[in-house]
């Protein structure tokens, strides 16, 4: 297994936000996390690269293994972890730099100075993110001039440039129009050949289109985790059925 979470609990102060979540994720698959707002799915996603460490009064208990390594071990370098486990946020967040420098940024921060290598890596990353053909003639222009959908794909390229093996996406298309959303979904499908992807989404159609497995969270608990087709067509739990049929959420 690429990822193994065992009895994961998260507390924000006295608030018990995530309650004993256990699930395993295979390499080169897409896993969707669904559930109503505040159910714990984004909190669980942030556990994968220890982004919760940056939140005051947040405490994480349980084990999370990535490639067999306990990522909560004191010996784990969080900078290296976040390089290996990239993250794309809900709202596109390009830096106020050129398109080229947005992608090159992570390489430079990690000590890469070889100009030819950086040039090649920027092109490779933009191609991986299905953006190269749209920006190859304007790499020196500001990333802020791109459309919202292009900015989000640029953020994906920026994450890919440092060669992660896992890509976390927290509602990556929720702020985008339908055409841009379709491009992001197609990109997710293509990227899973090279990466293990975990995506938080409120859009159940998106979860069913893009993912191999789906986890349904409710009030901090993992209610059901199954193959996506099975979960959406023949859920085992009544709460899952009620949610996917729109009876609450």
Swiss-Prot record:
Biological process (GO), any one: phosphate ion transmembrane transport
**PROSITE patterns per the UniProt record, alphabetical:** ABC_TRANSPORTER_1, ABC_TRANSPORTER_2, PSTB
What is the top EC class of this enzyme, as a single word? translocase
- Note the topology in the membrane: Peripheral membrane protein
**UniProt-recorded Gene Ontology molecular function terms:** ATP binding; ATP hydrolysis activity; ATPase-coupled phosphate ion transmembrane transporter activity
Give the primary localization class: membrane
Q: Which reaction does it catalyse?
A: phosphate(out) + ATP + H2O = ADP + 2 phosphate(in) + H(+)
Residues annotated as coiled-coil are none
Highest taxon of the lineage: Bacteria
Indicate the family of this protein. Belongs to the ABC transporter superfamily. Phosphate importer (TC 3.A.1.7) family.
The entry describes its oligomerization and partners as: The complex is composed of two ATP-binding proteins (PstB), two transmembrane proteins (PstC and PstA) and a solute-binding protein (PstS).
Known role: Part of the ABC transporter complex PstSACB involved in phosphate import. Responsible for energy coupling to the transport system.
Its protein name is Phosphate import ATP-binding protein PstB
Q: Which organism is it from?
A: Cytophaga hutchinsonii (strain ATCC 33406 / DSM 1761 / CIP 103989 / NBRC 15051 / NCIMB 9469 / D465)
């Amino acid at each position: 297994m690429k990822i193994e979470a065992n009895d994961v609990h998260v507390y924000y102060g006295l608030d018990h936000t995530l309650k004993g979540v256990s699930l395993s994720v295979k390499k080169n698959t897409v896993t969707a996390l669904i559930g109503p707002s505040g159910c714990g799915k984004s909190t669980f996603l942030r556990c994968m690269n220890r982004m919760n460490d940056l939140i005051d009064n947040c405490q994480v208990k349980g084990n999370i293994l990535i490639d067999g390594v306990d990522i909560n071990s004191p010996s784990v370098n969080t900078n290296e972890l976040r390089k290996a486990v990239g993250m794309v946020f809900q709202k596109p967040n390009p830096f106020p730099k050129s398109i080229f420098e947005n992608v090159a940024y992570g390489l430079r921060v990690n000590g890469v100075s070889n100009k030819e290598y950086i040039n090649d890596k920027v092109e490779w990353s933009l191609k991986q993110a299905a953006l190269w053909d749209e920006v190859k003639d304007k790499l020196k222009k500001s990333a802020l001039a791109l459309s919202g959908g292009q900015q989000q794909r640029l953020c994906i390229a920026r994450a890919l440039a440092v060669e992660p093996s896992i890509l976390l996406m927290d509602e990556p298309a929720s702020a985008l129009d339908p055409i841009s959303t379709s491009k992001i979904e197609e990109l997710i499908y293509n990227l899973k050949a090279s990466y293990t992807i975990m995506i938080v989404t409120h859009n159940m159609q998106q979860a069913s289109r893009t993912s191999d497995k789906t986890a349904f969270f409710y009030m901090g608990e993992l209610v059901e985790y199954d193959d996506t087709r099975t979960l959406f067509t023949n859920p085992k739990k009544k709460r899952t059925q009620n949610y996917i049929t729109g009876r609450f959420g």
